[in-house]
Amino acid sequence: MAGRIKGITIEIAGETTGLQNALKDVNKRSNDLTKELKDVERLLKFDPGNVEALAQKQQLLTQQIENTTQKLDKLKAAEQQVQAQFQNGKISEEQYRAFRREIEFTERSLNGLKNNLGNMKAEQENVASSTRQLETLFSATGKSVDDFAGALGNRLVNAIKSGTATSRQLDQAIGLIGR
């Protein structure tokens, strides 16, 4: 990404600097967050109900959204200067197109992160809703999850008891108990 916008200089707060240098901190932070997010997602692949990892993923996504928004703001702030440089012949058409692609890429990346965070929040709401349904069912029947171990299986019962069951697992439990 960073190599795409070489040779473009902009003025920020009265100082002339290369666009790459202006984005250096934001890009470094983005790379660090991406690496950490990949580690968390790898853990979640093996343990999808890990509450600590889910909380970390949500926090990292939020930080990544903030960071990407900051990058997009810097790119948008430089846009007029870059356009003027292109019109005056100070930068090539290639450089200008690369700058435009960088803005597009950053916008799409930001939208993807927001969707990912939204999907995560929707999953949390589904888990909360299914948990409430199970609690209502247990209180209405006067039974506990252990009473349904035969129908649910020990793995599902343990996931429900430890709070690591996914919304799909909770829906499955509701379906099995409701029979």
Per-segment meaning from a language model:
Residues 1-4, 8-18, 22-50, 54-88, ...:
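Residues at a specific register/face of alpha-helical coiled-coils
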